[in-house]
Every structure is written in structure tokens, then in C-alpha cells.
């Protein structure tokens, strides 16, 4: 697709959002982050959370006008599915990772950018209660982008191409 004035700003917003997410991640990698309190009394935790929130807003903004407005709500529903399934698996001590199911579903339906927004929204909302989750923002972004790009290439068109990878993924030790 050729870049024109209408699409260039969308790409710029996505790149800036990913850069902000990586900057927030680098802040969590610092040795200082492990010693600070993981509530919002720490400036470092609060600034990481604000950077990730701003990145999520930029991802949503990049899709405004490109998709119907109701589709912009999909990442919020996907994030709620992620948080619900993640808390259920943690409480039931099931050794499976179900906290990215919503991200994968939204990425398949709405594309990689909204899949990335779902992963980032999950991190931002989960970071309110567990600030350690903020360090895993790149994981949600990567999963949303990878699954969305695979869906665009038609990887999920056949049932057999879904069942085998899902069974391998679900049987992975936690």
C-alpha cells in the first residue's frame, strides 16, 4: 500500500506507540524498578503506567475513522476477557496461559493494530492492581501484532492450522 498523507500519520502513531511502550519497558528493566514500591506512590511506576496508557491511546487513535466505531470497542472487550481468564487460571492454579486469548481473538477479527491495543490495554488495566504486569507490555504488543499478521496471511483459514498450534501452546508448561 502506498503511503499518502491520510495513512502516514497512522503509521507514525503506531511507531510512536511502540516506541513509548519500549521506553516504558526499559524503565522496568532498570535495577531500580525492582526496589521501588509497586504502587503509584513511586514516580517510576506511575510514569511507566502513563507511558503505556498514552501508547494505548495512540494505537486507538491510529485506527479512528479507518474502522467502524463499534470495532474500536473490541480491544476493551478483549482486555476484559484476558483479565477474566488470567485471574481464573491464577486462582485455579491451572498451568496454562489463557491471559492472551482476548488479544488473539481481537487480532484475528480486527487486525494487528487493534490486537496490539488489546494487549496494551490489558497491561494498563492489570497494572492498576499488579504493577509488575507493566513489565510485560511488549509481550501483549508482540502477540497482538503476530496473530494479526498471521490472520491477514490466512494462517487461520483452515481448522487443522488452528488445532495443532493451539494444542502445543496450551500444553506448554507454565
Question: What are these language model-derived features?
Answer:
Residues 1-174:
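Loop-helix junctions at membrane interfaces
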Amino acid at each position: 500500500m502506498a503511503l499518502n498523507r491520510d495513512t502516514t500519520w497512522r503509521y507514525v502513531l503506531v511507531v510512536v506507540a511502540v516506541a513509548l511502550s519500549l521506553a516504558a519497558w526499559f524503565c522496568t528493566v532498570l535495577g531500580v524498578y525492582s526496589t521501588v514500591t509497586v504502587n503509584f506512590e513511586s514516580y517510576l511506576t506511575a510514569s511507566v503506567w502513563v507511558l503505556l496508557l498514552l501508547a494505548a491511546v495512540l494505537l486507538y487513535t491510529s485506527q479512528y475513522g479507518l474502522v467502524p466505531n463499534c470495532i474500536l470497542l473490541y480491544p476493551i472487550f478483549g482486555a476484559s476477557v484476558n483479565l477474566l481468564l488470567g485471574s481464573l487460571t491464577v486462582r485455579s492454579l491451572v498451568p496454562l496461559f489463557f491471559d492472551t486469548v482476548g488479544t488473539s481473538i481481537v487480532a484475528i477479527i480486527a487486525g494487528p493494530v487493534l490486537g496490539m491495543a488489546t494487549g496494551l490495554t490489558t497491561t494498563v488495566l492489570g497494572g492498576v492492581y499488579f504493577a509488575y504486569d507493566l513489565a510485560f507490555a511488549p509481550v501483549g504488543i508482540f502477540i497482538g501484532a503476530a496473530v494479526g499478521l498471521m490472520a491477514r496471511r490466512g494462517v487461520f483459514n483452515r481448522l487443522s492450522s488452528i488445532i495443532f498450534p493451539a494444542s502445543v501452546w496450551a500444553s506448554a508448561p507454565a
